[in-house]
Structures are given as structure tokens and as C-alpha cells.
Amino acid sequence: MSERNAASARTVACLLGPTASGKTAAALALAARRPIEIVSVDSALVYRGMDIGTAKPTRDERAAVPHHLIDIVDPADAYSAAEFRADALRLVAQIAARGRTPLLAGGTMLYYRALTQGLNDLPAADPDVRATLDADAARDGWPALHARLAGIDPATAARLAPNDSQRIQRALEVYLLTGQPMSALLAAPPRDNDAAAGLRFVPVALEPSERAVLHARIAARFDAMLEAGFIDEVERLRRRDDLHLGLPSMRCVGYRQAWEYLDGCTDYRTMRDKGIFATRQLCKRQLTWLRAMPERIVVDCCAPDATVRAVDALERVLDGRAPA
């Protein structure tokens, strides 16, 4: 964005951070001071019936402050970054038109990048292609499909673990639909970003000064989810004939581990440990994305007054006192 366009653009504050960094507390604290509406930037919160394992805001929290892009999709359905971008831009405009302040808050960095940088020309998901790949994986295993991907798109395969089923499937799907490797398509310039041209997104990032503190929070939160009935929640989902572990919804952190426990593949302790480890890995990926944003305003989420600091940073952004 040019200096002239930046000066005339409407600022949109964004509260980003990894799992368990305190985003909800900071957003609600800001809502006590300003007439905000929260637009969720979280790929797990879109799914209905997945409340405990996604740490969805409570009914009281959602009643106190308007929340958007929560409970909008059935777990049997997909929701893409392109759909998020269109929905988020529409909501930002509608909230501003009501005389209120939009606050984007969440930790799905792919969504944030799609919103702020636009999208490459990747094809939409194809159920038939995905069904074929799922069948191949059931027969041969995801490491075999990872090896297949390495033969056609070594750059993408190199950054994926052999069991990263969701991303391996997507990379193979893109190749089968376009005949081109995903790495080549992603290297192309994004499509025009006209819909966001009048907006200036400013990220406030909650990041840990001590990784061990965040890891302890993650473990405590996962244990609290288990005590709150997470296994029962997954069991209800598992009883549905139209849900399976290959769906994006069931790839949300914790759900696969709980499902496999219910299938008898692991014991309770192993399920817990795997769930916590998967959450820590998600946190690591989120921090990698954040640290690639030089424009972000960093708040130490481990500080005793982290919520106060985050609210202060967000208010500086909204008042035009943040660095340009």
C-alpha cells in the first residue's frame, strides 16, 4: 500500500496469537471500553457442535459482545480461506456502517494472510478427487502419498511431515486438478486485492517471552477440556455417519487424538499426551507465521499485565497512535 493510500485507509485492528496466549481475555477487555464486534480468525471456531475442544467463547461471552464467524458451518462441510476472506471483508464493512468497531481476533494465520495479501489461483476442493486420495491413503498410508507428492512437487513435500494428511491431500489435489505443483502456483502473484484496498490491517501479536509458560498453559487447558467433557463431545461427533477423520473439521487439534482413543487405538494417557503435543506443534507453527510479520506490534503474553498491555496496544492502533 502506498503512503497516500495508507493515509486514507481505514485502520482495522487485529489481535493475533498462538493457542492459549490470552486473545479472548484481551478482546473482551477491549469490549468493556469500546463498542467493538469481534470477527473470529479461527478455522476451528466455524464448526457447529465443536465447542469444548476448540475453546469456543462461552454463551455469556458471546452475549456480552457480538461475535462473528463462529458456528457457521456443519462439521461435515468445508470452509475455505477464500470464503473466510469474503465473509470477513463483508463483516468489517457492515460493522463499521453500524458505527461500531470491528476487531479481528484469532490464530489461523492462513486466514489472516488471505485477508491481507489476497489469494493465489488455487482450485476449490473437489470431493471426488479427495475421495480417491482418501482411498489411496487408506490402502497405502499417508507416507506413501507423501512420497508420491515428492515426485511431482518436491518443494511442497519438503516442508510437510509424512503424516500431514490434510496438507498432503491438498497438494496432490491441486496437482491433479491443475497439472501444476502447488509450490509454483503459490509463487505466482496473488489476485488483485481491491476488496481490501481501503483497509489497513494492523496486527497486535500476543507472543511468549518464555515458551515453557505457554506450554504449561496449553497442558492445563487441555486437561480442563477433558474435565469439561471433551471426550463426550467427540463421541457425539463420532456417532454421525457423515463424519470421519479425513474431514477438515476432524483434523482440528485434539479431535483426532480423542477419536483414536475412542476407537481403541490408544489409551487415555497417550491420548492426552498426543493432544497436548499436537497443540504445542500448532503453537510453534503459529509463532513462525507471526514472526514473519515485521509490521506486528508484539505484546508479551507471559507478562502478568498482558491483557492490559494488549488493550493499550489495540487502543493505540484504533486511535491512530500506532507506528505507521
Swiss-Prot record:
Q: Where is this region: Interaction with substrate tRNA?
A: 42-45, 166-170, 251-256
Keywords assigned: ATP-binding, Magnesium, Nucleotide-binding, Transferase, tRNA processing
The record, for SUPFAM superfamilies, names: P-loop containing nucleoside triphosphate hydrolases
Carries keyword tRNA processing? yes
Q: Which Gene3D superfamilies match?
A: 1.10.20.140, P-loop containing nucleotide triphosphate hydrolases
Q: Which Pfam families match?
A: IPPT
Asked if the record carries the keyword Transit peptide, the reply is: no
InterPro entries, per this entry? Dimethylallyltransferase, IPT, P-loop_NTPase
Query: EC number(s) per UniProt?
Result: 2.5.1.75
| GO MF terms, alphabetically ordered | ATP binding; tRNA dimethylallyltransferase activity
Please, one GO biological process term? tRNA modification
List required co-factors: Mg(2+)
Q: Where is the site described as Interaction with substrate tRNA found in this chain?
A: 108, 130
- Which reaction(s) does its UniProt entry say it catalyses? adenosine(37) in tRNA + dimethylallyl diphosphate = N(6)-dimethylallyladenosine(37) in tRNA + diphosphate
- Sites binding ATP sit at 17-24
Chain sites annotated for binding substrate: 19-24
Give the HAMAP family listed for this entry: IPP_trans
Q: How does it assemble?
A: Monomer.
Q: Which NCBIfam families match?
A: miaA
Membership in a protein family? Belongs to the IPP transferase family.
Q: What does this chain do?
A: Catalyzes the transfer of a dimethylallyl group onto the adenine at position 37 in tRNAs that read codons beginning with uridine, leading to the formation of N6-(dimethylallyl)adenosine (i(6)A).
Query: Mind telling me what this protein is named?
Result: tRNA dimethylallyltransferase
Tell me what organism the protein belongs to.
Burkholderia mallei (strain ATCC 23344)
Q: In the record, what lineage is assigned to the organism producing the protein?
A: Bacteria, Pseudomonadati, Pseudomonadota, Betaproteobacteria, Burkholderiales
